[in-house]
Amino acid sequence: MAFGKSHRDPYATSVGHLIEKATFAGVQTEDWGQFMHICDIINTTQDGPKDAVKALKKRISKNYNHKEIQLTLSLIDMCVQNCGPSFQSLIVKKEFVKENLVKLLNPRYNLPLDIQNRILNFIKTWSQGFPGGVDVSEVKEVYLDLVKKGVQFPPSEAEAETARQETAQISSNPPTSVPTAPALSSVIAPKNSTVTLVPEQIGKLHSELDMVKMNVRVMSAILMENTPGSENHEDIELLQKLYKTGREMQERIMDLLVVVENEDVTVELIQVNEDLNNAILGYERFTRNQQRILEQNKNQKEATNTTSEPSAPSQDLLDLSPSPRMPRATLGELNTMNNQLSGLNFSLPSSDVTNNLKPSLHPQMNLLALENTEIPPFAQRTSQNLTSSHAYDNFLEHSNSVFLQPVSLQTIAAAPSNQSLPPLPSNHPAMTKSDLQPPNYYEVMEFDPLAPAVTTEAIYEEIDAHQHKGAQNDGD
C-alpha cells in the first residue's frame, strides 16, 4: 500500500509541492527561476491561485525558521508582481494578512528588523491598491488598525529615493516662497504616491478636521434629542445634510490616510474617522427605526379600518327579522261569512279566538267551525294526545295526507271487562237466521301518524252478541 499526502494537505497539489521545495530552509538563496515557474503555474491553472495561497499560509504559519520566512516573503513579492488579479485578490484578504503576516510581528517569533519592515511594507503597499480593480478594503482596514495602535511603517524604496532627491534639490536651490496650504479635498495624491505636508498644509488640515468634529457633535446631539416617530422636521432636514457632508468627508479622510506620511496627522485622521463613522452609523440606525415605526403605524391603521367595516354586504347576511304575520279577516268579513254559512249549520269563531290562533296545518279546512258534531271518546283521546306534539306551520300544502272524518257512534253501556272478547263461534245463537236484527258494531278507526301507508284500517268489534247472550241468560 502506497502512503501519500492527503488531498487536504496544501503541499499535495502541484503548485503546493513546488512552493514547499522553493522555500525549504536547505535552499541557500532564492531560486528566481523556480519562483517564475511557480508564477506561470498560478496564471495558467484554474485552481493555481487558491492552491498557492494555501501553501503559502502553511509555510509561514507558526514558523520560527527565519530562513524559510525570508524565502517565502520573497516568493510572495514576486507572485504579487507577476500574477493576475485572481491571485492578488486572495493575497490581500484579511484572512491572510492579519492571521498570517501580522502574527509574525509578535515578539515571540523574534524576527530580524529587516524582515519585520518588509512585512509592514507589504501591508502598506497593498493598501494603496492594484491595477485591475482588486478590492483592497480588507488590507486597508488592517493597515489603519496598525496605524491606530502606533505601529510605525518604514518608508518604501520609492519614497526613500524621492526624499533623497527632494533633499538634494532643496539644498542646491532653496525655495523663495511658501506654497499655499491646500484644502482637505485637494490634499489627495495619485495612487502609489505619498504626500509630505508642510506646516501650512497641516494647519489647514487641522482646521478642516475641527469642522468635521463640530458636525459630528451636532449630529450626535440631534440624534439624542429626537425619537423615531416623534422627530422634529427641521432637525431631520439638518441631519440629512450633515449625513451627506459626513459621507463625503469620510471618503477624503480615507484617501488621506493612504498618502499622508505624517504620523501625528495620521493618528488624528484615524480618530476623526472613527467618530464620524459612529455618527453615520447612528443616523442609519435612526432611519431604520423611523421606517419600521412608520410601517407599524400603517399596518395598525389598515387593521383598524378592516375591523370597522362589515365583512359582507348587509343583503348577504341572514335575515333574522320576524316573519310577516298571516292576513286576518276583519269583523265585517266574519259576519258576512256567518250569514252565508248559516244555512249549512256552520259558524265561524269569534274575532278573539281567531286572533289567538296560529295558522293551521291545512288552512283550507276550518275544523273549528263545525257545530253540533258528536266526537267519539277515542277521537277525544287522540286529539288530547296530539295537542302536546309540535305544530309545523310550514308544512307543505300539497301533502298527500288522508283526513279522518268524524263518525257518529251509539253510546251503549257495556259490561266492564279486563280481558279481550273471544271470537264468536259459528253455531252461536246470535249467528242464527232467526235473529231478525243484524249485529251492531263499534267502528274503531286505528290511526298511526307515523305509518307509511295512506289508508286506514277499521277494526270491528261485535258488541250485540254479548248483549244478546246476556239477555238470553236473564230470560232463562
From Swiss-Prot:
Residues 200-288 form the GAT domain. Residues 392-395 are annotated as: Interaction with GRB2. Residues 442-445 are annotated as: Interaction with PIK3R1. It is found in: Golgi apparatus, Golgi stack; Endosome membrane; Cytoplasm; Membrane. It is a peripheral membrane protein. The modification Phosphotyrosine is found at residue 460. Gene3D superfamilies: 1.20.58.160, 1.25.40.90. The keyword Transcription does not apply. Pfam families: GAT, VHS. A motif (SH3-binding) lies at residues 421-425. Residues 155-179, 298-327 are annotated as: Disordered. GO terms for molecular function: clathrin binding; phosphatidylinositol binding; protein kinase activator activity; protein kinase binding; SH3 domain binding; ubiquitin binding. The modification Phosphoserine is found at residues 171, 314, 321, 323. One of its GO terms (cellular component) is Golgi stack. One of its GO terms (biological process) is ubiquitin-dependent protein catabolic process via the multivesicular body sorting pathway. Residues 22-154 form the VHS domain. InterPro entries: ENTH_VHS, GAT_dom, GAT_sf, TOM1, TOM1L1_GAT_dom, TOM1L1_VHS_dom, VHS_dom. The keyword Cytoplasm applies. Phosphorylated on tyrosines by FYN and LYN. PANTHER family: TOM1-LIKE PROTEIN 1 (PTHR13856:SF28), VHS DOMAIN CONTAINING PROTEIN FAMILY (PTHR13856). Interacts with FYN, GRB2 and PIK3R1 when phosphorylated. Interacts with LYN. Probable adapter protein involved in signaling pathways. Interacts with the SH2 and SH3 domains of various signaling proteins when it is phosphorylated. May promote FYN activation, possibly by disrupting intramolecular SH3-dependent interactions. Belongs to the TOM1 family. This is TOM1-like protein 1.
